[in-house]
């Protein structure tokens, strides 16, 4: 865990060696009927605030998912660095349900206590092809359950997601995702090394105005492994 944070610190410190550039700051607020994530429904109607700070090829984002009924909240951080058609991310996810009986401690990262999960992400999206592929691996916060009820080693649960898409206009994108669980992880209750867990069709359109944009989105998701499906829609504002 310490090595992970040291690596993040090194990346942040590297900003000082970059050529003088302006910081880019942006924000958005969206609301969706359901929070659909990697073949599962995390909560119902919710709001998603997001703040993004960019400098050169570095981007730091903070965003959350807060359900209207107060049952679910999630606070996420994502630090990314872009090189050509690749981007590399370190992310931290913090999620809690109101039904949790343990006291909340945002600053705990101990096994069996933390509600944080850290993830390493690699994305490839060629500019000349309507295709993208992303690899996600939990590096801390997700452990393999043992037969005696204790937690074992880190699961390194991974998720592979290819995407093909069509741009009707620069503001209209239709995407088809196929997500797979790689290695035993929570996506399959730690029972399968491989499973298709997410088939999603998503359409997203932006309405442009002088100083802001309004995103509109509709998604249909199927989880072949769980034999479940959901439909969701959302709207927001970007500034």
Predicted features and spans:
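Outer-membrane beta-barrel "beta-signal"
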Residues: 201, 205-207, 227-239
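Short loop/turn motifs that connect adjacent beta-strands in outer-membrane beta-barrel proteins
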Residues: 21-24, 89, 128-130, 166-174, ...
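Detector for outer-membrane/organellar transmembrane beta-barrel domains
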Residues: 108-185
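Residues that define the transmembrane beta-barrel architecture of outer-membrane proteins
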Residues: 23-25, 43-47, 71-75, 114-120, ...
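Cleavable N-terminal export/targeting peptides
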Residues: 1-24
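Outer membrane beta-barrel transmembrane domains
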Residues: 175-209
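Transmembrane beta-strand segments that form the barrel wall of outer-membrane beta-barrel proteins
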Residues: 28-35, 57-68, 88-96, 103-105, ...
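Outer-membrane beta-barrel initiation region
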Residues: 21-54
